[in-house]
């Protein structure tokens, strides 16, 4: 599955194993950009890194699709779509090369993820989790129609416990003519 941008050389497609190393680099750089980790706190090395094995496992997973944005042969973004029970999918691992931010690439990746959730998994709803303390990030997703469910998920880590806000969005189903 490939999505072409209206202008430029940007292409969004399902990642394969040839993209693994570039994706690992992108995700690590996106997570650690500007001295901040994905948690909004100073990064610890392990938190700002993802292993090549983890990337390869995501690419090979049966019930998920790792999408990659490529511009002129360079990986500039990614998003993970995972099939969940009950006609739902989850959006995760949204990352954009720090030099390509504020150009609408995140919006394109979200749109591609939504289309993939519908076309590949038949989902009628998509959800994501945002760190509860990251209000700006929750506001970003709200601009795309995601709304808080009121549900929070807690993830215990070695040094802290992280609390996530669950947000969902209904997906438009194509109307048969």
Go through each PLM region and give its residues.
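Conserved N-terminal entry element of GNAT/NAT acetyltransferase domains
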Residues: 1-21, 171-177
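A conserved beta-turn-beta hairpin within the catalytic core of GNAT-like acetyltransferases
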Residues: 83-94, 101, 120-124
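A short helix-loop-beta-strand connector motif used in the catalytic cores of GNAT acetyltransferases and
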Residues: 52-68
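Conserved beta-strand in the GNAT
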Residues: 68, 74-82, 90-95
